């Protein structure tokens, strides 16, 4: 039905958090539409722009799994759940490698990948 509101879950998949496959099963079983993982491959040595949450970056920024690997693991254990990057930092990536990862994840997930992109906040 047009106009139906759909809800998703976003979290930092980190080495100390719930594993992506277990989280994906829980999210799908509870009827959510989507699961979103961010990308944080580069920790700035210095910052000209403040992080909006305070002075220090939270622990999860230092321990975040690669979103394509984590979403691939989530895709392997789900059937309907849409899987997205929230967001992929495309300006920090090789475009050919990124295109290959996006196409692979979308194909292996049966077309369930949602490609959220951005540039990040640090100047």
Q: What residue ranges belong to the model's regions?
A:
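Flexible, glycine-rich active-site loops centered on histidine and acidic residues
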Residues: 2, 6-18, 90-123
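Conserved catalytic cysteine-centered active-site region
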Residues: 78-86
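Solvent-exposed polar/charged
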Residues: 76-79, 107
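Generic, ordered loop/turn and secondary-structure boundary motif
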Residues: 42, 69, 88-90, 122
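Short secondary-structure transition/capping motifs
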Residues: 59-63, 87-94
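Hydrophobic residues within beta-strands of alpha/beta enzymes
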Residues: 35, 83, 113-115
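N-terminal beta1-alpha1-beta2 module of alpha/beta enzyme domains
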Residues: 1-77
């Amino acid at each position: 039905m047009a106009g139906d509101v759909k809800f998703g879950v976003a979290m930092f998949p980190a080495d100390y958090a719930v594993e992506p496959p277990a989280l994906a099963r829980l999210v799908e079983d509870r009827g959510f539409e989507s699961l979103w993982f961010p990308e944080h491959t580069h920790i700035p040595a210095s910052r000209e722009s403040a992080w909006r949450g305070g002075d220090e970056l939270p622990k999860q920024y230092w321990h975040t799994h690669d979103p394509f690997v984590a979403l691939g693991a989530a895709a392997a254990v789900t059937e309907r759940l849409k899987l997205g990057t929230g967001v992929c930092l495309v300006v920090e990536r090789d475009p050919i490698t990124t295109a290959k990862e996006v196409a692979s994840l979308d194909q292996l997930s049966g077309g369930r990948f949602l490609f959220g992109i951005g540039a990040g906040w640090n100047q």
